[in-house]
Amino acid sequence: NTTFKVFLGYACLVIMAGIGVTMSRGGWLATGISIMAFLVMLLGHRKYRIQAGVALLCLLIGGFLVFDRSEGLKERLNQTLERDSSAPVSVRSLIWESTVDMWKDHRWVGVGPGQFDHAFQYYRHSEVQERPGWVHNDFLQLLAEYGVIGFGLIGLGLALLAAGAWKTRKYVLREARDFGKNRHSNRAACVLGCSISLLAISVHSLFDFNLYIPANGLLAVALAGILVSQLRFTTERHWWKSNLFNRVFASALILLIAFFMSAPLSARFQEAGLLRKANEAEPFSSIRMNALVQAAQVKPSNFETPYQVGEILMQMGRQFEPGYEEELEVAIQWFEKSLETWSDYSYPYAMIGRCLDSLGRIEEATPYFEKALLLDPNNIFVVAYM
């Protein structure tokens, strides 16, 4: 269908333009490598060799012309290629250095799944003062959290996926001489499209936390599943006929998983709504306070919510208006609730110290300040409170 092909061509141009204006260097690199890999693979197929060559030439010329006429693109790229000693240090590279130090202390099993954010304060670089949340390199975060053993197991799975895709490739690619029943098959497009898409996600994951975004993670898993399913065309061994028992068992298993996930997902949904309401309210308003308190009741395991409640009460108490002592005492209780969930969080210790200091209990405050400094020695905010 010629019309549909023209539509797809224009859609690709719009997508390319959208990626260009994101000003994401990682996005540009991932797009460039994936398109080059796609065209190189087509160059090896005699039926599409001419079209792939023309497309490659057009993209190279078009990319050069766009880059040559865009000062914004030049400036963005020069930030990477021409960084000198006077330029600001890349925060991302400092996070990577801290992550490598983290891995060196936990080489084999890592710090634990999802524990990077908690462990980062022990390895913080003095020029990185905020919580990064993620490493901004999925593979490095995988190594730090799961260690060599976990990284090796997951790497083995990825290697098997790549090997399966390569094995499937020669069975699904249609030659020009194929005039049989598979002439209009989309198997080759499916294998090639999923493979190139996963390549793009992998390249971008070197510079960001792609797979920690649920939508991206689900997309990657779906693409991998579709790619694996194409193995059935390589040999009859991969065909499996399901009977009634297997279908009933699989359905029951899915329903059981959905049942056990419904309660935590419902709580997460309620918490997200309350936190959104709190973020939209004025910083020290009663609306924000009530929303945060309700969110803490819905999901007590979130250490950040009680900390935020305590911070609001502390700021109100430090106005030193009548009744401020009670506000500071309640703030201390909320900070302690935060520590019940994450006992090594440095900020609640520092805030408890501030509350006690404001109450004139300086001797009681000192151990809390020292504990905060011990947990997060390179945090200038913690140091300032000392």
Predicted regions and their residues:
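A juxtamembrane structural motif centered on a specific transmembrane helix
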Residues: K5, E175-A188, L223-S266
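Membrane-embedded alpha-helical segments of integral membrane proteins
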Residues: M16-I33, S185-R237
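Lipid-exposed faces of alpha-helical membrane segments in multi-pass integral membrane proteins
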Residues: V6-A17, L29-V40, L57-L60, I149-A162, ...
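A membrane-periplasm/extracellular boundary helix in multi-pass inner-membrane enzymes
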Residues: N1-T2, L13-T31, F38-D105, P113, ...
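Hydrophobic transmembrane alpha-helices and their immediate junctions
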Residues: V148-A189, G360
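Structural signal for the C-terminal ends of transmembrane alpha-helices
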Residues: N1, M36-R46, F67, A162-K170, ...
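TM-adjacent membrane-interface loops and short helices in multi-pass inner/ER membrane proteins
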Residues: N78, V91-L142, Y146-L153
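C-terminal luminal/periplasmic domains and tails of membrane-associated envelope-modifying transferases
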Residues: L275-M386
